[in-house]
Amino acid sequence: IASGDWSSDVCSSDLVTSDKIPSDLLELVDGLHFHTLCEQGADDLQTTLKAVEDQFGAYLHQVKWLNMGGGHHITREDYDVDLLITEIKRIRETYNLDVYVEPGEAIALNAGYLATEVLDIVENGIETLVLDASASCHMPDVLEMPYRPPLRDGFEAQEKPYTYRLSSNTCLTGDIIGDYSFEKPIEIGDRLYFEDMAIYSFVKNNTFNGIGLPSLYLMDKEGECSLVKAFGYQDFKERLS
C-alpha cells in the first residue's frame, strides 16, 4: 500500500528507498521481498544481494524472512546452482531468517506446446491464417509484453518462401500472434504448434468472446498423449456466475 510521497507504481525505481522507510515501520514488517531478476543466473542474484545488504542490511536482522523473488533460471544448462545454494545458506546463517525463492519459469523452461488448427486463410495485404487459438485468450503475453512465441517449423517473416500473418477468430482488433514464414504453403486444417507454452499459457487463459479454453494433455517419453482435463461451456458459464 502506497501513500503520501511513496509511488503507487510497484515497478517504479523510486518506490521505496532506505531513507524513506519510517523508523517504526519494521514493527509491522515480518519480511522483505525483492524481484529484480528475469531469466538471470546466480551471479546476477549475487549482485542483487550485495545491493540489498548494502541498502537494507540493518533491517534483515529484524525480519523473519527474505523472499528473493523469481526470474532464477535454475534449470538452464549453464546456471550455477552451487552459487545459488551458497548464497541462500549465507543469507540464512548471517541474518537468521527463512529464505524463499519463487519457482518462476525455470520449472517448465522450454516445455509445453499449444496446438492450434488453421480454420481459414484470408487475404488482406498479407495472407492471414485464422487460428482456433488466440493471443488475447491463450497467449496474452504476446500482446502485453509484447512477445513472439516460438513456432515449430516457423521462421521469421520473409526468411522462408511462404509468409503468413497468424491471427485468431475473436473480434478483438489486433488479436494477432505475429508474422511467420514457412518452407511449404499452409493449408486450411493444418496443425501448428507453438512451443515453450507451459509457462504463461494456462495460468493466464481466459474465455473472452466465448473462445474455449484448450484441453490439457500430458505427453510421456514415448510421445503418447493422455487427456488430463477438457473444458466446455459449463466451465465458461461457471466463471461468470
Residue ranges and their predicted role:
Residues 28-38, 188-190:
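Internal alpha/beta core interface subdomains
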Residues 36-37, 66-75, 103-105:
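Glycine-rich beta-strand-to-loop/alpha-helix junction loops that act as flexible
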Residues 11-13, 28-33, 63-67, 98-100, ...:
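Structural preference for beta-strand elements that scaffold enzyme active sites
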Residues 35-55, 128, 132-134, 155-156:
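Active-site pocket-lining/capping segments in soluble small-molecule metabolic enzymes
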Residues 87, 103-241:
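Charged (often Lys/Glu-rich) extended helix/loop segments that serve as interaction or gating elements
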